[in-house]
A protein has these predicted regions:
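Enzymes that bind and transform nitrogen-containing heteroaromatic metabolites
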Residues: 1-191
Length: 191
């Protein structure tokens, strides 16, 4: 069965973006970018690939992406309606007008039911791209986490997971530290 994997970058205090959705304050490094792009090339948006010297590598882990409106809007705001054309794309939103691109599927209700349906299909894993509100709604469905933790404190912003108090244990399976002080931790949900 396919897994839902929340692959996300966060501050030390648990924010994936600033209050206005900004994320340009994360300290990036060539070492970290190269490592993560090698492992997960499908997470690089299609329109960005030529600018980072990436051709069209095969999808290694994911063949489907699910994102909330806030994660979809940055591409849409620059005229890109299909940011991950190399993946099956689902955008969860109750407020977004219809999407004029047949490659992007709009999910207006019950994202959990959509994930349960997608998990039964053949294929690679499903990448939960964000955001925090959607991750909170889908927390019971999240099987694995890949958390890029950057050495910065934001103080406020969009939390990694917004929801109700519902502790769920995950077990770390690997951790890697990079030259910019950031780390990536891979975690699996406890049974």
């Amino acid at each position: 069965m396919r897994k839902l994997v929340y692959y996300v970058g966060t501050t030390l205090d648990g924010y994936i973006a600033g209050p206005g959705g900004e994320f340009d304050f994360f300290p990036l490094s060539d070492q970290m970018t190269a490592s993560m792009n090698e492992r997960y090339p499908e997470t690089v948006p299609t329109h960005i690939r030529p600018h980072v010297g990436m051709g069209n590598p095969p999808n290694r882990v994911f063949d489907t992406v699910l994102m909330g409106r806030g994660s979809y809007e940055p591409a849409r705001s620059v005229g890109v309606s299909s940011p991950y054309a190399h993946l099956r794309q689902y955008v969860v939103s109750t407020t977004l007008p219809d999407i004029d691109d047949p490659a992007v599927n709009l999910v207006r209700t019950d994202p959990s039911a959509k994930i349960q349906e997608l998990k039964t299909e053949e294929g690679q894993d499903i990448w939960l791209c964000g955001g925090g509100i959607l991750a909170g709604e889908l927390l019971p469905e999240i099987d694995e986490l890949i958390v890029k933790r950057y050495p910065v404190i934001a103080g406020a912003g969009i939390p990694m997971i917004a929801g109700t108090f519902e502790p769920i244990l995950f077990t770390p399976t690997a951790n890697e530290v990079f030259d910019n002080g950031a780390s990536v931790t891979w975690l699996k949900r406890n049974s």
